[in-house]
Protein backbone atom coordinates (compact mmCIF):
# COMPACT_ATOMS: atom_id res chain seq x y z
CA UNK A 1 0.00 0.00 0.00
CA UNK A 2 2.81 2.45 0.79
CA UNK A 3 5.37 1.08 -1.70
CA UNK A 4 3.15 0.89 -4.69
CA UNK A 5 2.40 1.52 -8.34
CA UNK A 6 -0.97 2.98 -7.34
CA UNK A 7 -1.22 6.70 -7.88
CA UNK A 8 -2.97 8.68 -5.16
CA UNK A 9 -4.61 11.00 -7.68
CA UNK A 10 -6.37 8.09 -9.40
CA UNK A 11 -8.76 7.83 -6.45
CA UNK A 12 -10.04 4.81 -4.64
CA UNK A 13 -12.96 2.88 -6.14
CA UNK A 14 -14.44 0.00 -4.14
CA UNK A 15 -11.20 -0.29 -2.16
CA UNK A 16 -9.18 -0.62 -5.39
CA UNK A 17 -6.69 1.98 -6.54
CA UNK A 18 -5.71 2.98 -10.07
CA UNK A 19 -2.32 1.85 -11.34
CA UNK A 20 0.41 4.08 -12.75
CA UNK A 21 1.70 1.38 -15.12
CA UNK A 22 1.05 2.18 -18.79
CA UNK A 23 1.76 0.31 -22.01
CA UNK A 24 3.68 1.94 -24.82
CA UNK A 25 1.72 1.98 -28.08
CA UNK A 26 3.80 -0.89 -29.48
CA UNK A 27 2.21 -3.16 -26.89
CA UNK A 28 5.28 -5.04 -25.68
CA UNK A 29 6.86 -2.44 -23.36
CA UNK A 30 5.42 -0.71 -20.32
CA UNK A 31 6.51 1.95 -17.85
CA UNK A 32 5.51 2.69 -14.28
CA UNK A 33 6.28 5.14 -11.51
CA UNK A 34 6.52 3.56 -8.08
CA UNK A 35 5.80 5.71 -5.03
CA UNK A 36 7.52 4.88 -1.75
CA UNK A 37 5.72 6.54 1.14
CA UNK A 38 6.60 3.95 3.79
CA UNK A 39 8.54 6.51 5.86
CA UNK A 40 6.00 9.33 5.43
CA UNK A 41 4.25 10.06 8.70
CA UNK A 42 0.55 9.60 9.38
CA UNK A 43 -2.02 12.36 9.59
CA UNK A 44 -5.49 12.00 11.07
CA UNK A 45 -8.91 13.43 10.41
CA UNK A 46 -12.19 12.88 12.19
CA UNK A 47 -15.10 12.12 9.88
CA UNK A 48 -17.84 13.74 11.95
CA UNK A 49 -20.52 12.75 9.41
CA UNK A 50 -19.84 9.01 9.61
CA UNK A 51 -22.72 6.83 10.79
CA UNK A 52 -23.47 5.83 13.45
CA UNK A 53 -20.53 7.62 15.14
CA UNK A 54 -17.64 9.84 14.07
CA UNK A 55 -14.71 7.84 12.71
CA UNK A 56 -10.96 8.45 12.75
CA UNK A 57 -9.34 8.40 9.30
CA UNK A 58 -5.60 7.82 9.04
CA UNK A 59 -3.53 8.52 5.94
CA UNK A 60 0.02 9.37 4.93
CA UNK A 61 0.72 13.06 4.35
CA UNK A 62 3.83 15.12 3.70
CA UNK A 63 4.06 18.39 5.58
CA UNK A 64 6.47 21.25 5.07
CA UNK A 65 9.71 20.54 6.89
CA UNK A 66 9.20 16.76 7.12
CA UNK A 67 12.37 14.73 6.78
CA UNK A 68 10.61 11.78 5.17
CA UNK A 69 8.66 12.42 1.97
CA UNK A 70 7.54 10.25 -0.95
CA UNK A 71 10.38 8.85 -3.05
CA UNK A 72 9.88 7.93 -6.71
CA UNK A 73 11.21 5.12 -8.90
CA UNK A 74 10.80 4.73 -12.66
CA UNK A 75 10.62 1.23 -14.12
CA UNK A 76 10.51 0.19 -17.77
CA UNK A 77 9.59 -3.37 -18.68
CA UNK A 78 9.65 -5.44 -21.84
CA UNK A 79 7.09 -8.26 -22.05
CA UNK A 80 9.01 -9.99 -24.86
CA UNK A 81 12.28 -10.29 -22.91
CA UNK A 82 10.61 -10.37 -19.46
CA UNK A 83 13.11 -7.75 -18.34
CA UNK A 84 12.30 -4.84 -16.01
CA UNK A 85 14.81 -1.99 -15.68
CA UNK A 86 14.92 0.46 -12.80
CA UNK A 87 15.92 3.77 -14.38
CA UNK A 88 18.27 6.08 -12.48
CA UNK A 89 16.22 9.29 -12.34
CA UNK A 90 17.85 10.73 -9.21
CA UNK A 91 18.97 14.33 -9.47
CA UNK A 92 17.82 16.05 -6.28
CA UNK A 93 17.10 14.71 -2.82
CA UNK A 94 13.34 14.23 -2.32
CA UNK A 95 12.46 15.20 -5.90
CA UNK A 96 8.97 14.86 -7.41
CA UNK A 97 8.53 13.00 -10.73
CA UNK A 98 5.82 13.13 -13.43
CA UNK A 99 5.63 11.11 -16.65
CA UNK A 100 4.94 13.43 -19.60
CA UNK A 101 4.96 11.50 -22.87
CA UNK A 102 5.80 8.10 -24.37
CA UNK A 103 6.99 7.94 -27.99
CA UNK A 104 5.00 5.92 -30.51
CA UNK A 105 7.94 3.60 -31.21
CA UNK A 106 8.51 2.89 -27.47
CA UNK A 107 12.13 4.05 -27.71
CA UNK A 108 11.76 7.24 -25.65
CA UNK A 109 9.95 8.16 -22.44
CA UNK A 110 9.79 11.78 -21.31
CA UNK A 111 9.45 12.80 -17.69
CA UNK A 112 9.73 15.90 -15.53
CA UNK A 113 11.45 16.08 -12.17
CA UNK A 114 11.09 18.87 -9.64
CA UNK A 115 13.36 19.89 -6.83
CA UNK A 116 11.59 19.68 -3.45
CA UNK A 117 11.70 23.47 -3.14
CA UNK A 118 9.72 23.67 -6.44
CA UNK A 119 12.03 26.35 -7.85
CA UNK A 120 13.87 24.12 -10.31
CA UNK A 121 12.81 21.39 -12.74
CA UNK A 122 14.10 19.36 -15.65
CA UNK A 123 12.41 17.81 -18.66
CA UNK A 124 14.23 14.56 -19.40
CA UNK A 125 14.10 11.75 -21.93
CA UNK A 126 14.91 8.10 -21.21
CA UNK A 127 16.27 5.82 -23.91
CA UNK A 128 14.15 2.75 -23.15
CA UNK A 129 16.73 0.39 -24.66
CA UNK A 130 19.75 1.55 -22.65
CA UNK A 131 18.10 3.27 -19.67
CA UNK A 132 20.17 6.39 -20.31
CA UNK A 133 18.59 9.65 -19.09
CA UNK A 134 19.26 12.92 -20.92
CA UNK A 135 18.22 16.36 -19.66
CA UNK A 136 16.51 18.33 -22.45
CA UNK A 137 15.29 21.42 -20.59
CA UNK A 138 16.53 22.79 -17.26
CA UNK A 139 14.31 25.48 -15.77
CA UNK A 140 14.88 27.69 -12.71
CA UNK A 141 12.15 30.03 -11.51
CA UNK A 142 12.43 31.83 -8.18
CA UNK A 143 10.73 31.80 -5.79
CA UNK A 144 8.91 28.75 -7.22
CA UNK A 145 7.64 27.14 -10.42
CA UNK A 146 3.89 27.40 -10.88
CA UNK A 147 2.84 23.76 -11.22
CA UNK A 148 -0.77 24.69 -12.00
CA UNK A 149 0.26 26.79 -15.02
CA UNK A 150 2.75 24.33 -16.47
CA UNK A 151 2.21 23.46 -20.11
CA UNK A 152 4.36 20.99 -22.00
CA UNK A 153 3.29 19.68 -25.39
CA UNK A 154 5.11 17.08 -27.45
CA UNK A 155 4.76 17.66 -31.19
CA UNK A 156 5.68 15.29 -34.02
CA UNK A 157 6.16 12.40 -31.59
CA UNK A 158 8.65 14.28 -29.43
CA UNK A 159 10.71 15.83 -32.23
CA UNK A 160 9.56 19.22 -30.95
CA UNK A 161 8.60 20.32 -27.45
CA UNK A 162 6.45 23.34 -26.72
CA UNK A 163 7.29 24.47 -23.17
CA UNK A 164 5.70 27.27 -21.13
CA UNK A 165 8.05 29.27 -18.94
CA UNK A 166 7.99 32.42 -16.84
CA UNK A 167 11.77 32.83 -16.96
CA UNK A 168 11.38 36.36 -18.36
CA UNK A 169 8.89 37.34 -15.67
CA UNK A 170 6.02 36.77 -18.10
CA UNK A 171 4.49 33.53 -19.33
CA UNK A 172 5.85 32.62 -22.77
CA UNK A 173 5.98 29.47 -24.87
CA UNK A 174 9.34 28.22 -26.11
CA UNK A 175 9.87 25.70 -28.91
CA UNK A 176 12.64 23.14 -28.35
CA UNK A 177 13.86 20.43 -30.68
CA UNK A 178 14.23 16.77 -29.67
CA UNK A 179 17.74 17.43 -28.35
CA UNK A 180 16.68 20.29 -26.08
CA UNK A 181 17.90 23.10 -28.34
CA UNK A 182 15.84 26.30 -28.25
Language-model segment annotations:
Residues 17-19, 70, 96-98, 119, ...:
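Beta-rich catalytic cores
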Residues 39-45, 71-73, 118-124, 169-174:
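Structural motif
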Residues 78-82, 128-131, 177-181:
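Short loop/turn segments that connect beta-strands within beta-propeller blades
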Amino acid sequence: RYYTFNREDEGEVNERMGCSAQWFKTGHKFYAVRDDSRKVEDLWLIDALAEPRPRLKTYKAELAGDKNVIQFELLIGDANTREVKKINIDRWKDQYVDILYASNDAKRLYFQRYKRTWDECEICVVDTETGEVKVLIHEVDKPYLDYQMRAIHFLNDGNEILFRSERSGWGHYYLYDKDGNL
